[in-house]
Amino acid sequence: MNREALCHDDPIGHDRLRPDSIPRDPKWTDEQWQAITARNSDILVAAAAGAGKTAVLVERLIGIIKEGVDVDRLLVVTFTNAAAAEMRERIRTALTKELARHPHQTWLRQQLVLLNRATITTLHSFCLDLVRKYYYRLDLDPAFRVADETEIALLRQDVLDEVFERFYERAGAKEGTESKGEYFTALVDAYGGDRDDSPLQDIVLQLYEKALSQPWPEQWLQDILGKFQEAGDTIAEQTLPGELPAWEALPWFAALREEMSIDLAEVESLLVRALSLCRQPGGPAAYGDAVTADLQLTQDLHLAAGRSWTQLHECFQALSFTRVKAVRGPVDESLKKEVSRLRYQAKKKLTDLQKKYFLRTPHDLVSDLTQVLPLMATLVDVVLAFDRAFQAAKREKRLVDFNDLEHFCLRLLLDESASPGVPVPSSLALELKEHFAEVLTDEYQDTNTVQETILTLLSRNNRFMVGDVKQSIYRFRLAEPNLFLEKYRSFSPYDTPGPVNSDHGAPDHAFSGQGASVPGARIDLAKNFRSRRNVLSAVNDLFRRIMTPRAGEMAYDRQAELVYGAAFPELPGRSGDPVIELWLLQRQPDADGSEESIETQQNANETKGAIDGDHKNIAKAGESPAQNTADVAGESPSDDAGEDAGQPTGGEEELLLLETAQYEARLAARRIEELMKSAMPVYDREQGGYRPVCYRDIVILMRSTKGRADIFLEEFRAAAIPAYADTGAGYFEATEVSILLSLLRVIDNPCQDIPLAAVLRSPIFRFTGEDLARIRLAEPRKTFFDAIEAFIGQAEAAARDTFTPIDPVAIRLREFLRQIDAWRTLARRDSLAKLIATIYRETGFYDYAGAMPGGGQRQANLRALYDRARQYEATTLRGLFRFLRFIERLQDQGGDLGTARTLGEKEDVVRIMSIHKSKGLEFPVVFVAGLGSQFNLQDLRRDLLIHKNLGLGPVVVDTQLRYRYPTVAKLAIQRRLHRETLAEEMRILYVALTRAKEKLILLGTVREVAKSAQQWLHDAEGIPVAAALPDEVLLRAKCYLDWIGPALVGHPDGQEIRRWAEGAPALGATLPENNLTMTKNETMTEQERIDGSSRWRLFYAAKKELIGLRKETGSETPFNPVWLEKLRRLEPIIPTDLVDASLSWSYPYTGLSGIAAKVAVSRIKKQFVWHSPETPPSSETPPSLEIPPSLETPPSLETQTPSPDALVDLRPRFLQQDRRLTATERGSAVHLFLQHLDLAGEISQAGIAGQADRLVKLELLSLEQRQALNEEEILRFLESPLGHRLRKAKQVMREVPFTLALPAAEIYPEKRAEGESVIIQGVIDCLFEEDDGWLLLDYKTDRCPVGMDRERWLQQLRDSYLGQVNLYHRAVESVLKVKVKGRCLFLLSIGREMAL
């Protein structure tokens, strides 16, 4: 370009070039050039992965600057500071090159100067600059600072605790019967959890954060509350004939009808398949009529779902099924069985929908919303109160957080006349709007609503937005991908730009060729310049099948597909691109086939619990669909299979997940070895040619690195593969950090035994375990610090008495105390950072850490601790004590700082990272692991859900009868969030697969390959190869393999799935070596490349085939003379193989991890019965115990409906409305009275009353307990034959505590616990001695339920307490060594003795 005419000394007056007159640079594609040169309107660039969007954005900026726009008149918003710095540097480089060609152009020099103050930054940084400049308009202290995330999190929790405390105080004051305080009490009871109110606090914070993502947070809160008020209004409205009820307009019913359409479409597909089988030769034609009737019924339901909830409810109320006719004549049994299975699934789905959504009338559903309205109003009040208190606390400390920056900026840009939905710009906004010639936004798909409002106020149809909605994976940070989608749908495709106006602002006319007004233009950058053709074809083949508008929030159509644009030169001897590998790891089933898959176990535990877990303890039958509710994702054979096996405990499930990660890591390690051994060629653009693959070319991606990355590191270490994982955790567990924190705790307070012992044993002071034992013996009863002083005193006295040298340990201890005292003085006088620096210098610990294995990382961690101390003291807090409390609170809340990063880009190691952290990066070889791990749907299990559009979704909770069930609002929000979560997971998978440049290897685990393959075949049956899978199949997915498997069924290379489904190859067969080495068909052919179809190779491996893959590390290392030289150079000399052997050691007692060391009788009493209940045991042989099969699984709380009288109010006493004791508390009062009863006193009702009053005066009984005593029942007991025996006994022992050790195998027979013991603790009500032995007595206050047969109740009581008395019997004879001649219960409520 000729810059002589353009870049002269007076840039203001020169003629500007029109974009359409700029000649096209051949290095850019047509679409890229359009994105670079288009002007005069809002422009949305949908840039696919690897499309070079950053280069396009920089080139556009350079072009605008060349047109005469000063660089400081451009607002460029990036997602990260690193992206902003990179963009600024690229612009500087381009301007510098231009200046080199035109050295006399002062205008170019001016742009380089202006670049330093150009607004190329993150949105938060822009907001911060604006707030700093106009702080006085916001009534902010000019010395404010942006709080650290950890600091603000701790302050937020403090403020929230204070707000809750104020609401508790208001509740305790009882200001009126309908006060907000009482509603707060009900709110805590309903949503506060069983142990504390932290679940409710989480809800408050979640709602608060959700509100802050809206431009008008308070108005948004009032709007979502208004939906519940509107529901109440609709109940009273009269409906005219032919009109729909007013409540039909409530958003939750419309949302649920949309979800019903998806469910009914699945039922239709099942029945259509069944009907086609009926009509096949040999099919059960007699079933055809019933299946046809079912299909017609389903279609009618589908039509009703599109009309109104009223019609849909009526149709479901009339739901009935036609009986099938008997099959006569010859028939294919396999077809008959398949038709029966399909029809059963369809009927079950319909009946499940009926039970979950339609057992209760619409009026009842709306009434539920009015019932929870006061609680939702109180919740909003709490959120608003927290907001006010939080803002006040931040102002007091002169702090702002990132949310404040956005909303303060918004306040500056909004005029006082602005109102919700009407963002009127302020004078400042108008000024900035005129100043900025263009507003450019990178990663636009990750923008939220507040940020969108800010950018809109700063622009005048001069926005340029770049992003890829398929890579929007930050919904958890409240990003709103729909902002991108709405513009993409409303903007017209770019055609021909109109003339440029003089302000580089609003367009003279629109982009349309007809001149019609459109809101903006869109440009698709579909060409991918990163990956090989086969990688792109594989991504297209997969997402064309799974990304649909309903399941993925957009269609993966021609505009969304990736187009090959990279230039990979041909390599001699190589025929084409590497194939995509999909590895299925087979977890070997048990011999009886009862082992359950990880996926299915998690299905039942998480997903089904998430959707069905709201229906708990319905008070009356039919009031709410409490049972047999369906999973939102539908039914599947794997779901059914999962019901046959017992579910594992949480600990067992975690072990299964870790085991799966271990074998996937082992396979990945072997595959990496093969790639390195074969010297797989990769193209290096910097070198301009091919080179052998290096470790740094390889990345392992996983959905979450927590708990998995460490396992991969361990396996890679065992295989001698260098690897690095940035897990963002593990900092506090690092040895060097733990030692320094212990030392700081000792400096703060030396009377802390554990930190003190840790410091003494540390490399800083190097005391041995024997030294510590001797110190403790000097003073066994006091603190360890006292023991040190006592040891020194005793050693000095002994030296004086015996005229011998002082014990060397005492000398070292005296020096230790002197050093600690000096540091304590320094801590009081100087900064915390200086204290830490002094410790590093005086102890040499920093240098010592550098000489340890991994010394660079350790020193980086120590530097991070020093930096953290400096940052801490930059806050409003000071001092060592507060810093340590800060660290402790951070750890208590599960926080971590993450190990310091020391890895450089060029270091030759395999990277292990989460998919989120990989966004924006690229690697020649990408492994995606954990594809069989289930999606995390735990949030759907919350008692109260929140949605940006549908508002609040609570459950109805009756704290007296102890049941809960979801409102229609929660049902709707639950389904909507489920869909949005799966859409996000689909985009995360897209990001993972598009990181690969040359080779993609996928790893996933299934229980049995054959069963998984059969399910995938069912899911894809009848679907054309080029068509998307049904939404109901996609929404049923529990893991990524549930999408990948069905999508590959119709692929030419997916035939392997059919072979697996048929049982070939045989499961458990030895894994062929060439399956690992990939010696055949490594690349796709030229014809396949031309056709555009992707090439895959599918493998499976059973667990037993992977066990032998790990290399064993030797245990001995001969002496090496080089060590002496390393010692002279102060380098570490520890043999790495010995370190590896130690670090790879596996804990041998994993099987005992779920066994309690101590357990109360009340926790296990129902598990124990005699082998022969009718034969009482002899005193010589204590009774043996077993767990009855019916009690192996504890009864679910959801199946029990305790009587209100049996429930304990979990609220604090001062919050309880009714101070009457519960049945449990009354029983405790009776036991307490009988424990202190004087058996020699007067036995009459008056005498019992007198003794009870005496115990009240002695404060052994409370007044409430005294009033709960039934004196007649107690008198009846004392006057009974058993009571007479008790009063005449030779010796009486009451409330006898005991501790008994039992073999763990008796308590946990399912564990491998040979040789282990469990401590059993309990209290025996009464033991009394007679002439011929001891009698064991247990008195009970149970009462027979109304309407229940007494004999049946007595039998239930006997069965219930038999195990408890058995344990008491065994304890007495084992501990007291006395003979128990008999055992009995006394039922106080009926005055009856029961021998056991």
From Swiss-Prot:
* Molecular function per GO: 3'-5' DNA helicase activity; 3'-5' exonuclease activity; ATP binding; ATP hydrolysis activity; double-stranded DNA binding
Task: Please list the residue ranges that the record marks as compositionally biased, kind Low complexity.
Answer: 1181-1199
Question: Residue ranges of region Disordered?
Answer: 1-25, 590-649, 1171-1205
The residues that hold ATP are A47, A48, A49, G50, A51, G52, K53, T54
What domain of life?
A: Bacteria
The UvrD-like helicase ATP-binding domain covers 26-532
What are the recorded Gene Ontology BP terms? Answer: double-strand break repair via homologous recombination
Q: Provide the alphabetized UniProt keywords.
A: ATP-binding, DNA damage, DNA repair, DNA-binding, Exonuclease, Helicase, Hydrolase, Isomerase, Nuclease, Nucleotide-binding
Entry EC no(s)? 3.1.-.-, 5.6.2.4
Alphabetical list of InterPro entries matching this protein? AddA, DNA_helicase_UvrD-like_C, DNA_helicase_UvrD/REP, P-loop_NTPase, PDDEXK-like_dom_sf, PDDEXK_AddAB-type, Restrct_endonuc-II-like, UvrD-like_ATP-bd
PROSITE patterns listed in its UniProt record: UVRD_HELICASE_ATP_BIND, UVRD_HELICASE_CTER
**Needed cofactors:** Mg(2+)
| GO cellular component assignments | cytosol; DNA helicase complex
Looking at the record, the residues that make up the UvrD-like helicase C-terminal domain are 615-920
Catalytic reaction annotation: Couples ATP hydrolysis with the unwinding of duplex DNA by translocating in the 3'-5' direction; ATP + H2O = ADP + phosphate + H(+)
Q: Which Pfam families match?
A: PDDEXK_1, UvrD-helicase, UvrD_C
Role of this protein: The heterodimer acts as both an ATP-dependent DNA helicase and an ATP-dependent, dual-direction single-stranded exonuclease. Recognizes the chi site generating a DNA molecule suitable for the initiation of homologous recombination. The AddA nuclease domain is required for chi fragment generation; this subunit has the helicase and 3' -> 5' nuclease activities.
Entries under PANTHER family matching the protein: ATP-DEPENDENT HELICASE_NUCLEASE SUBUNIT A, UVRD / RECB / PCRA DNA HELICASE FAMILY MEMBER
Similarity section: Belongs to the helicase family. AddA subfamily.
- Subunit comment for this entry? Heterodimer of AddA and AddB/RexB.
Protein name listed in UniProt: ATP-dependent helicase/nuclease subunit A
Q: Which gene carries the instructions for this protein?
A: addA
